[in-house]
Amino acid sequence: MRIYYIGVFRSGGEKALELSEVKDLSQFGFFERSSVGQFMTFFAETVASRTGAGQRQSIEEGNYIGHVYARSEGICGVLITDKEYPVRPAYTLLNKILDEYLVAHPKEEWADVTETNDALKMKQLDTYISKYQDPSQADAIMKVQQELDETKIVLHKTIENVLQRGEKLDNLVDKSESLTASSKMFYKQAKKSNSCCIIM
């Protein structure tokens, strides 16, 4: 999973204007980087120009996907990733970037400019392109799910480690003196109920 490009554009009008951008082209050969970078800028500019206010869209081009979010304020975010990068974290990140950009640079600063300048750059993009290579950093739900999956794995390993070699939970339940007869019966009934659903 990889993010190659993050861009913020002034949209609306015939041609979108790139206000701030960052690229991570380290995956490409030295001599390819310039051409790939130019293509990504061209692609981002084109899709930003052709995305209506309030729209989100993902456009596949070769091995890449351009995630685009155009806001009603006249600003648009573009994220170019590989095909494995999940869609929800991509749009979560775009929303965060556009929110922060509008706070740092109100519309009055960029609405009438004819070309970009350093004053309109968003310095956090350099941090974001490395931090959010891991999509779970952008998506809190995905992060919680990942933590739950890790906990589940630890629990399964713990139960296996508690049981000695060749020992089975059924035998431990039968030998247990701390379980009442009704608890033992409940365990056996629950096991039977669960086993009837197994497809072999």
From Swiss-Prot:
Name the residues where the record annotates lipidation as S-farnesyl cysteine. C197
Identify residues that carry Phosphothreonine.
T158
UniProt GO BP: amphisome-lysosome fusion; autophagosome-lysosome fusion; endoplasmic reticulum to Golgi vesicle-mediated transport; Golgi to endosome transport; Golgi vesicle fusion to target membrane; intra-Golgi vesicle-mediated transport; intracellular protein transport; vacuole fusion, non-autophagic
Q: Where is the Longin domain?
A: 7-129
Keyword Protein biosynthesis listed? The answer is: no
Q: Which family does it belong to?
A: Belongs to the synaptobrevin family.
Matching entries from SUPFAM superfamilies are given as: SNARE fusion complex (SSF58038), SNARE-like (SSF64356)
Task: Specify the protein's topology with respect to the membrane.
Answer: Lipid-anchor
Indicate where a lipid (S-palmitoyl cysteine) is covalently linked: C196
User: Which keywords describe this protein according to UniProt?
Assistant: Cell membrane, Coiled coil, Lipoprotein, Membrane, Methylation, Palmitate, Phosphoprotein, Prenylation, Transferase
Q: Which domain of life is it from?
A: Eukaryota
Q: Which organism is it from?
A: Saccharomyces cerevisiae (strain ATCC 204508 / S288c) (Baker's yeast)
Q: Propeptide residues? A: 198-200
Boundaries of every v-SNARE coiled-coil homology domain copy: 140-200
Its annotated compartments are: Cell membrane
Q: Which GO terms describe its molecular function?
A: palmitoyltransferase activity; SNAP receptor activity
This chain belongs to which protein, by name?
Synaptobrevin homolog YKT6
Q: Which GO terms describe its cellular component?
A: autophagosome membrane; cytosol; endoplasmic reticulum membrane; endosome; endosome membrane; fungal-type vacuole; Golgi apparatus; Golgi cis cisterna membrane
Which is an annotated Pfam family here?
Synaptobrevin
**Which enzyme type, at the first EC level?**
transferase
Coiled-coil zones: none
Give the Cysteine methyl ester positions (modified residues): C197
Protein EC: 2.3.1.-
